């Protein structure tokens, strides 16, 4: 392991819904790549315990998706609360990237950041204020070069580690097929 200011921190959260005032984080995963998108390390993948009452607030899509993946059961039996998951994630990141230098990287990470700000503020503050949001490139490709979208198929497992691995691969695809140097 080698701390490097050019390494990138990738994150994905699974939540009980989309509203950070009402909904909660139920899974967190991170990984670190070098500047060329080579995966250097995968961080802890943690189900975050939430009460039965909180889980009962999920809409039909979230119940179906997170029950089908086994995440709801993992959340019910998880020993980790928000703070535990936050601290374990930060300890992992400290080995690879200094605080305050990596943008937050992933797909639709603005949404993830809203939840981090609310429930894991120390982790949110670990990131630089900038974003590397793969969904931005997808939206631009859809408008400017839609023919390339068919070349990358997402699995959409809605499991945090699978989703971030896929985000890294998707950015590498856009780098090769959309971004011209």
UniProtKB/Swiss-Prot annotation:
Q: Where in the cell is it found?
A: Cytoplasm
This protein's GO cellular component annotations are: cytoplasm
Q: Name the EC number(s).
A: 3.1.15.-
Q: A single GO molecular function, which one? A: nucleic acid binding
Keywords tagged on the record:
Cytoplasm, Exonuclease, Hydrolase, Nuclease
Q: What class of enzyme is it?
A: hydrolase
InterPro entries from the xrefs? Exonuclease_RNaseT/DNA_pol3, Oligoribonuclease, RNaseH-like_sf, RNaseH_sf
Specify the Exonuclease domain's residue ranges.
8-171
Q: What is the similarity comment for this entry? A: Belongs to the oligoribonuclease family.
**Function of this protein?**
3'-to-5' exoribonuclease specific for small oligoribonucleotides.
Name of the protein: Oligoribonuclease
What are the leading ranks of the lineage? Bacteria, Pseudomonadati, Pseudomonadota, Gammaproteobacteria, Enterobacterales
What is the primary gene name for this protein? orn
